[in-house]
């Protein structure tokens, strides 16, 4: 199935109509931006992370997003994840920092095996570290420019999930199809939280329709918002903080006409 602007628009409209509640266990650095971008898309965020409340909270949502930037909240991720798995909710894992921390990598792999996520989304270095069970960089930024797409497909097939590697080109696979998304802008790598925001947006899209096509549509949607924000930033002579605000703006201002920029292919 090809990813058209009409398909993306249908998903976006459905999100705005249904206002799905997305449970995000994410890090303190990006929690505000993650909540705001979900609101901009028409979804409803809840950022609960106490282990004594997350099971009750996640039971009333459409999707759960577990961000390993919040590794201290691992117990909460595990508890919420088990409930989400039992209820058939979409579960997204963002393996922040697994490329530079063996502890995070081991805990992430355990979580994958225990809660059966719908989707894993990370940068190239994080995805490679998960697949190869080794450190690939120091810190959380991606140093990789290339990735073995066949290895990604095999990993996704083994764990019955959608795997997304975000970078200059986003690679999306469910173990069968492999989609390449070429939307996006270099400024997205210059702000903290663009990856975290992408992951919570996947919560909104996959919580509305759980499919690899929906995941690819989300990647295009986020990338297009980045392109439009970059153009506005350049036009006003703004910097990175201006770009961040325009980025969230463009999510709320998205139209089907703008979605015609979609560059996704198999």
What are these model-derived regions, one by one?
Residues 1-44:
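Glycine-rich phosphate/adenosyl-contacting loop at the front of the ribokinase-like
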Residues 3-6, 224-266:
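Charged C-terminal helix
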Residues 104-178:
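Conserved phosphate/ATP/ADP-binding segment of small-molecule kinases
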Residues 151-156, 211-226, 247-248:
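Short, well-structured alpha-helical segments that form the helix of a local strand-helix-strand
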Residues 182-192:
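Short pre-catalytic strand/loop immediately N-terminal to key active-site residues, enriched for Gly-Thr
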């Amino acid at each position: 199935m090809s990813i058209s602007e009409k398909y993306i628009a249908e998903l976006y409209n459905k999100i705005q109509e249904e206002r799905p509640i997305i449970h995000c266990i994410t890090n303190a650095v990006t929690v505000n931006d993650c909540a705001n971008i979900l609101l901009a898309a028409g979804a409803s965020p809840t950022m609960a992370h106490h282990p004594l409340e997350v099971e009750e909270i996640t039971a009333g949502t459409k999707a759960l997003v577990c961000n390993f930037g919040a590794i201290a909240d691992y117990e909460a991720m595990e508890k919420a994840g088990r409930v989400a798995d039992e209820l058939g909710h979409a579960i997204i894992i963002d393996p922040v920092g697994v490329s530079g921390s063996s502890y995070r990598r081991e805990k992430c792999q355990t979580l994958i095996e225990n809660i059966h996520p719908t989707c894993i989304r990370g940068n190239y270095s994080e995805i490679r570290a998960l697949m190869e069970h080794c450190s690939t960089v120091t810190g959380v930024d991606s140093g990789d420019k290339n990735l073995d797409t066949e290895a990604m497909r095999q990993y996704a097939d083994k764990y019955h999930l959608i795997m997304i590697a975000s970078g200059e080109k986003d690679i999306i696979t469910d173990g069968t199809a492999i989609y390449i998304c070429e939307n996006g802008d270099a400024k997205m790598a210059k702000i903290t939280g663009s990856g975290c925001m992408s992951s919570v947006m996947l919560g909104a899209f996959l919580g509305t329709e759980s499919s690899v096509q929906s995941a690819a549509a989300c990647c295009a949607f986020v990338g297009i918002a980045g392109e439009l924000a970059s153009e506005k930033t350049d036009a006003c002579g703004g910097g990175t903080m201006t770009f961040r605000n325009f980025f969230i703006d463009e999510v709320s201002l998205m139209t089907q006409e703008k979605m015609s920029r979609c560059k996704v292919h198999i």
